[in-house]
Amino acid sequence: MEIRWLGHSAFEIITDEGLNILIDPFISNNPACQIPVEEFNPDIILVTHGHSDHLGDAMELSNKNNVPVAAIHEISLFLSKQGINNIGVNIGGSFIYRGVKFTMLDAKHSSVLDIVEEPLPAGDAASFLITLEDGTKLFHAGDTGLFGDMKTIIGEIYKPDIALLPIGDKFTMGPFEAALATRWIDSKVAIPMHYNTFPPIEQDPSIYANFVSQLNPNIDVVILNPGEYFEYNPENYQD
């Protein structure tokens, strides 16, 4: 599986079977992403919540590629009114798309649709667990603060292999809280996100990596630059 960070919370995931998954596709207005939005050809798009820096280019890319946008029910209703192909889901629910299982889990954050003049309710903020055909699990936390279910539900029940976690502070967890979340989730690999896009969330990711190393040195923290890939091979992370 290839994981490409696009800056902020946007990721492109390409499975070994060739499924292209785009998460929180904030691309065209993302100062950290230098890749033109026209270059993306997703098979499915995931949106964790309604803020414009996460919904991003989802509607344009859905129309261009005729692919669904998976989002919480309230965002799904909005997308339907715009004529956008979508899959509505809610916290704790799952669906299977082309052999891959997608599970919507909790996040602690606000959510409105702020791309319209009068912001609309957008349900709860969420996270996604992606389970590939070979059993590999990737967790995208969305925007979130630290909360106990990261340990008791996400870590102990779902057991992701890879965790993508925000570290920017102010609007989400900061580096230390994110390191605690990383220890609780206990993934094999952790990739920081949602930082250095704008001045209020400037962070040195090595501080986060150092905190994780102190809490659990067995977790591999992978720090990517926007546009860089990480290739995950389960054979390299055997227990």
Swiss-Prot record:
Belongs to the UPF0173 family. The keyword Hydrolase applies. Keywords: Hydrolase. Transmembrane segments: none annotated. InterPro entries: Metallo-B-lactamas (IPR001279), RibonucZ/Hydroxyglut_hydro (IPR036866), UPF0173 (IPR022877), UPF0173_UPF0282_UlaG_hydrolase (IPR050114). The keyword Hydrolase applies. This is UPF0173 metal-dependent hydrolase Msm_0779. Pfam families: Lactamase_B_3 (PF13483). GO terms for molecular function: hydrolase activity. It comes from Methanobrevibacter smithii (strain ATCC 35061 / DSM 861 / OCM 144 / PS).
